[in-house]
Amino acid sequence: MRVDLFDFDLPDERIALRPAEPRDSARLLVVNPHAESRPHAESVPHAESRPHAESAFSDHRVGDLPSFLRAGDALVFNDTKVIPAQLEGIRHRDGAGGQQVSATLHMRVGPSRWKAFAKPGKRIKEGDRIAFGHSGESCLLGSLDATVEEKGEAGEVTLAFDLSGPALDEAIAAVGHIPLPPYIAAKRPEDERDRADYQTIYAREEGAVAAPTAGLHFTPALFEALDRAGIERHFVTLHVGAGTFLPVKADDTADHKMHLESGTVSAETAARLNAVKARGGRIVCVGTTSLRLIESAAEESGEIRGWSGATGIFITPGYRFKAVDMLMTNFHLPRSTLFMLVSAFSGFETMHAAYKHAISTGYRFYSYGDASLLFRKDK
């Protein structure tokens, strides 16, 4: 499909620079192509007073989520934890003077090796030495130095650090910064609040460069409400990479290549999710990262298997979903792979109309913005 078919106009003022407080007070746009199956507005505490009759859309709050789920449904969360993966340093070559460079780590490929996006990418060569954390910041744990081992396309490099394992992790934590999405970083600098705001309350597996942002809306109070409603919670891990921020430069979706991200679905979690399906429950993914991982781990039959590896799954309209029934996700960029994914999930025309509604009624977009709850069009 042509990439420009996924374009839309988004006013700058719709981009959220801070999250809602409390987190579960964010707005929730429910998008149900099968409108007759959604709850009546009067049964949902925070339904906004707008006639929905036969509409596929209804306006709510994230705290209303239990009203749209049934006992026995299962929420699938991505428990990856964002690391301070934005590094600043000085490049050295053949004993010559240094040049300022930045690198955003995006996928670990060994105890001492990371793939990263480096700037200025054109001036970096294989064999270059980069000393990170030496310009105005001291690394208390020793030099965070690396060699450029490989150079790929679009500024991607493989860095071989002198440190390894936990020592490398501690050094990165000491000098790195939270890599805010470009659309936020362009409007304000990262600050201490972001270290908490840009992390889910259940994050535990370190390795992500970007937060699984749909999960940012969850609070202990919302978890308690979901427990009372008999909704199961399960966790998988997909370490979100910096590739999620990269624009689609191709003119056709067939020519776009996704960057790989590493993830794991344990055999135990797979078995529990299969049991949910067998009992008639629904698999509800919290975030596109959870969905992409579950779909990567699913057989054509819909059975989910234990899985570990790197996925580059690219979901566009025409994709046949194998396991996921519902999706909770934030509002995405025009022409992005994630808007393509939601268009595949709930329908191309439906999602264009949903985003038009969201923009006209003041929903907040992107990582710190509001959320949507999507029903699958072919269910």
Curated annotation (Swiss-Prot):
Stretches the record annotates as Disordered: 35-58
Family statement: Belongs to the QueA family.
Catalysed reaction, written as an equation: 7-aminomethyl-7-carbaguanosine(34) in tRNA + S-adenosyl-L-methionine = epoxyqueuosine(34) in tRNA + adenine + L-methionine + 2 H(+)
Matches recorded under NCBIfam families: PRK00147.1, queA
Pathway assigned in UniProt: tRNA modification; tRNA-queuosine biosynthesis
GO annotation, biological process: queuosine biosynthetic process; tRNA wobble guanine modification
GO molecular function, one term: S-adenosylmethionine:tRNA ribosyltransferase-isomerase activity
UniProt keyword annotation of S-adenosyl-L-methionine present: yes
Keywords: Cytoplasm, Queuosine biosynthesis, S-adenosyl-L-methionine, Transferase
Organism listed in the record: Rhizobium leguminosarum bv. trifolii (strain WSM2304)
The name this protein goes by in its record: S-adenosylmethionine:tRNA ribosyltransferase-isomerase
Function: Transfers and isomerizes the ribose moiety from AdoMet to the 7-aminomethyl group of 7-deazaguanine (preQ1-tRNA) to give epoxyqueuosine (oQ-tRNA).
Cross-referenced PANTHER family: S-ADENOSYLMETHIONINE:TRNA RIBOSYLTRANSFERASE-ISOMERASE (PTHR30307:SF0)
Broad class of the protein's primary localization: cytoplasm
Gene Ontology cellular-component terms listed: cytoplasm
Pfam families in UniProt: Queuosine_synth (PF02547)
Subcellular location(s) of the protein: Cytoplasm
